[in-house]
Protein backbone atom coordinates (compact mmCIF):
# COMPACT_ATOMS: atom_id res chain seq x y z
CA UNK A 1 0.00 0.00 0.00
CA UNK A 2 1.29 3.44 -0.92
CA UNK A 3 2.36 5.65 1.98
CA UNK A 4 -0.15 8.41 1.17
CA UNK A 5 -2.96 5.85 1.16
CA UNK A 6 -1.78 4.49 4.51
CA UNK A 7 -1.94 8.06 5.83
CA UNK A 8 -5.57 8.58 4.80
CA UNK A 9 -6.40 5.12 6.12
CA UNK A 10 -5.05 6.13 9.54
CA UNK A 11 -7.37 9.16 9.39
CA UNK A 12 -10.32 6.80 8.92
CA UNK A 13 -11.08 7.03 5.18
CA UNK A 14 -14.02 4.90 4.03
CA UNK A 15 -13.52 1.65 2.13
CA UNK A 16 -14.82 3.11 -1.16
CA UNK A 17 -12.37 6.01 -1.00
CA UNK A 18 -9.49 3.68 -0.17
CA UNK A 19 -10.28 1.42 -3.12
CA UNK A 20 -10.62 4.41 -5.47
CA UNK A 21 -7.32 5.89 -4.23
CA UNK A 22 -5.34 2.76 -5.17
CA UNK A 23 -5.45 3.91 -8.82
CA UNK A 24 -3.31 6.96 -8.08
CA UNK A 25 0.39 7.29 -7.33
CA UNK A 26 0.12 10.40 -5.18
CA UNK A 27 -2.33 12.49 -3.22
CA UNK A 28 -1.98 15.48 -5.60
CA UNK A 29 -2.78 13.20 -8.55
CA UNK A 30 -5.84 11.78 -6.77
CA UNK A 31 -6.91 15.26 -5.64
CA UNK A 32 -6.87 16.54 -9.23
CA UNK A 33 -8.97 13.60 -10.44
CA UNK A 34 -11.43 13.30 -7.57
CA UNK A 35 -15.10 13.92 -8.37
CA UNK A 36 -16.30 13.31 -4.82
CA UNK A 37 -16.40 16.67 -3.09
CA UNK A 38 -17.65 14.96 0.06
CA UNK A 39 -14.46 12.89 0.27
CA UNK A 40 -12.33 15.96 -0.28
CA UNK A 41 -14.17 17.94 2.40
CA UNK A 42 -13.85 14.99 4.78
CA UNK A 43 -10.08 14.86 4.30
CA UNK A 44 -9.70 18.60 4.73
CA UNK A 45 -11.88 18.40 7.83
CA UNK A 46 -9.54 15.84 9.35
CA UNK A 47 -6.54 18.10 8.63
CA UNK A 48 -7.83 21.67 8.99
CA UNK A 49 -7.33 22.18 12.71
CA UNK A 50 -9.53 22.71 15.71
CA UNK A 51 -13.00 24.28 15.48
CA UNK A 52 -12.56 28.04 15.38
CA UNK A 53 -9.06 27.91 13.88
CA UNK A 54 -8.26 29.85 10.70
CA UNK A 55 -7.83 26.62 8.73
CA UNK A 56 -11.23 25.46 9.89
CA UNK A 57 -12.87 28.77 9.00
CA UNK A 58 -11.51 28.60 5.45
CA UNK A 59 -12.86 25.07 5.13
CA UNK A 60 -16.25 26.18 6.48
CA UNK A 61 -16.49 28.86 3.76
CA UNK A 62 -15.74 26.24 1.12
CA UNK A 63 -18.32 23.91 2.63
CA UNK A 64 -20.92 26.69 2.59
CA UNK A 65 -20.25 27.25 -1.09
CA UNK A 66 -20.84 23.54 -1.67
CA UNK A 67 -24.00 23.61 0.47
CA UNK A 68 -25.39 26.38 -1.71
CA UNK A 69 -25.46 23.86 -4.58
CA UNK A 70 -28.34 22.12 -2.80
CA UNK A 71 -30.50 25.23 -2.40
CA UNK A 72 -32.34 24.73 -5.71
CA UNK A 73 -33.69 21.47 -4.24
CA UNK A 74 -35.18 23.18 -1.18
CA UNK A 75 -38.95 23.59 -1.16
CA UNK A 76 -39.98 27.04 -2.36
CA UNK A 77 -40.52 29.40 0.56
CA UNK A 78 -38.36 27.38 2.98
CA UNK A 79 -35.64 29.79 4.10
CA UNK A 80 -33.97 27.90 6.98
CA UNK A 81 -31.30 26.14 4.90
CA UNK A 82 -30.23 29.39 3.19
CA UNK A 83 -30.24 31.24 6.52
CA UNK A 84 -28.15 28.50 8.10
CA UNK A 85 -25.57 28.86 5.34
CA UNK A 86 -25.52 32.64 5.78
CA UNK A 87 -25.07 32.38 9.56
CA UNK A 88 -22.27 29.88 9.06
CA UNK A 89 -20.55 32.10 6.49
CA UNK A 90 -20.78 35.06 8.88
CA UNK A 91 -19.11 32.96 11.59
CA UNK A 92 -16.34 31.87 9.22
CA UNK A 93 -15.67 35.51 8.29
CA UNK A 94 -15.72 36.65 11.94
CA UNK A 95 -18.74 38.85 11.25
CA UNK A 96 -21.54 39.76 13.61
CA UNK A 97 -20.40 37.98 16.74
CA UNK A 98 -21.80 34.63 15.54
CA UNK A 99 -20.93 31.70 17.79
CA UNK A 100 -20.70 27.98 17.11
CA UNK A 101 -23.87 27.66 19.23
CA UNK A 102 -25.67 30.05 16.83
CA UNK A 103 -24.66 27.82 13.94
CA UNK A 104 -25.83 24.69 15.74
CA UNK A 105 -29.22 26.25 16.46
CA UNK A 106 -29.64 27.34 12.84
CA UNK A 107 -28.57 23.92 11.58
CA UNK A 108 -31.07 22.14 13.81
CA UNK A 109 -33.84 24.26 12.33
CA UNK A 110 -32.69 23.51 8.79
CA UNK A 111 -32.47 19.79 9.54
CA UNK A 112 -36.00 19.84 10.94
CA UNK A 113 -37.19 21.58 7.76
CA UNK A 114 -35.41 19.05 5.55
CA UNK A 115 -36.91 16.10 7.39
CA UNK A 116 -40.40 16.86 6.20
CA UNK A 117 -39.61 18.74 3.00
CA UNK A 118 -38.28 16.15 0.60
CA UNK A 119 -38.48 12.44 -0.02
CA UNK A 120 -35.42 10.32 0.61
CA UNK A 121 -35.14 9.60 -3.13
CA UNK A 122 -35.16 13.30 -4.07
CA UNK A 123 -32.51 14.04 -1.45
CA UNK A 124 -30.36 11.19 -2.82
CA UNK A 125 -30.59 12.53 -6.39
CA UNK A 126 -29.77 16.06 -5.24
CA UNK A 127 -26.78 14.85 -3.23
CA UNK A 128 -25.18 12.93 -6.07
CA UNK A 129 -25.94 15.58 -8.67
CA UNK A 130 -23.75 18.15 -6.92
CA UNK A 131 -20.74 16.03 -5.87
CA UNK A 132 -18.64 16.89 -8.95
CA UNK A 133 -19.47 20.61 -8.67
CA UNK A 134 -18.54 20.44 -5.00
CA UNK A 135 -15.21 18.79 -5.88
CA UNK A 136 -14.48 21.63 -8.30
CA UNK A 137 -15.27 24.19 -5.59
CA UNK A 138 -12.97 22.44 -3.12
CA UNK A 139 -10.11 22.37 -5.63
CA UNK A 140 -10.63 26.07 -6.37
CA UNK A 141 -10.03 26.97 -2.71
CA UNK A 142 -7.70 24.24 -1.40
CA UNK A 143 -4.58 22.61 -2.78
CA UNK A 144 -4.09 18.92 -2.20
CA UNK A 145 -3.04 18.25 1.39
CA UNK A 146 0.57 17.23 1.81
CA UNK A 147 1.30 13.57 2.41
Predicted feature locations:
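Short, glycine-biased loop/turn motifs at secondary-structure junctions and
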Residues: 1-147
Amino acid sequence: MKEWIRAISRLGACKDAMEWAESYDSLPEAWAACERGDWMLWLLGRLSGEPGSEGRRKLVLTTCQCARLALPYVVEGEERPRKTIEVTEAWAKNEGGITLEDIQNAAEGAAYAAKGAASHAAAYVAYYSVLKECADIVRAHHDAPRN
